[in-house]
Structures are given as C-alpha cells and as structure tokens.
C-alpha cells in the first residue's frame, strides 16, 4: 500500500498569504474552511490582547522578516504554484487513504504541530525553520529540519 500525502500546519504561519494558498483549491468549501482557520487564530490572538500581525519573533526581524505577510509567504512557498490544496484537516485527523496536499489546523508550536501530523499518520517529517530550531518525535523514524 503506497499513499502519498503532504500536510502543512500552523494557521498563524499563513496569515497574509492566503491568496497564494487558495490559488488552487478544488471547491469553495475548502477555501471557506481554510479562511475559518485563519479567522479563528486571529480571533484567539485578539482575545489575548495580541495581534496576529505581530507574530514575527526577534529572530525573524533580525533576518529581515519585518511583517507577518513576508514571513507567511515563505511558509506558503513550501507549496508549488501547481499544487492543489485538497482540503483541511482538524488537529490529528487521520489522513488514511487521502492523497495530495492537505492543511492541518494545528497549534502554532513546533512540537504540537509535529505531534498532530504524526497522529494523522505521517511517517516522515521534514520541518524547515528560519531560526534552525530542531524538533524530533519519538514515533517518526526520520524527523529533521531542512
């Protein structure tokens, strides 16, 4: 049995890059669900007195990522222009026989997002960061930063 799927996580990593992500979606429902993840993240941030636009860290600023849109475009570019966003997965929702490119609504934290992907059935995790933070997971045979 050979299943090929890829998932991207972190709603907060894509604030401001939604047009690029939604350029190729199979339905209005997928686009709507993706935008709901963004709105929920922004609403939660606002409840805590924080703006989703203020997400970049000190390390991001140091490396020239001065606003969330610039940072988000870097995350979004992990998807090629031709790649279709097949759908939205809830945190740790099983991928099962689904193929293609999926977005998982995870917390904006390295270890929590990787745990959700592993619980969904991912067996290889390639995690790229600008600051070189390294995360690993005991249930994934290969987990490395790019």
Q: Could you describe each region identified by the protein language model?
A:
Residues 1-5, 9-146:
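Anaerobic metallocofactor- and corrinoid-dependent redox/one-carbon enzyme cores
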């Amino acid at each position: 049995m050979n299943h090929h799927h890829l998932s991207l996580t972190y709603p907060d990593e894509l604030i401001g890059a939604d047009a690029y992500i939604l350029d190729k979606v199979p339905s209005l429902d997928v686009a709507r669900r993706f935008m709901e993840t963004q709105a929920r993240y922004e609403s939660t941030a606002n409840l805590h007195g924080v703006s989703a636009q203020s997400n970049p860290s000190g390390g991001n600023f140091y490396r020239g990522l001065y606003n969330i849109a610039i940072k988000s475009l870097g995350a979004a570019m992990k998807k090629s222009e031709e790649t279709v966003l097949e759908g939205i997965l809830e945190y740790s929702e099983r991928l099962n026989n689904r193929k293609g490119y999926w977005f998982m609504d995870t917390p904006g934290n390295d270890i929590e997002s990787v745990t959700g992907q592993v619980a969904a059935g991912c067996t290889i995790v390639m995690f790229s960061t600008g600051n070189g933070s390294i995360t690993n997971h005991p249930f994934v045979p290969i987990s490395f930063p790019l």
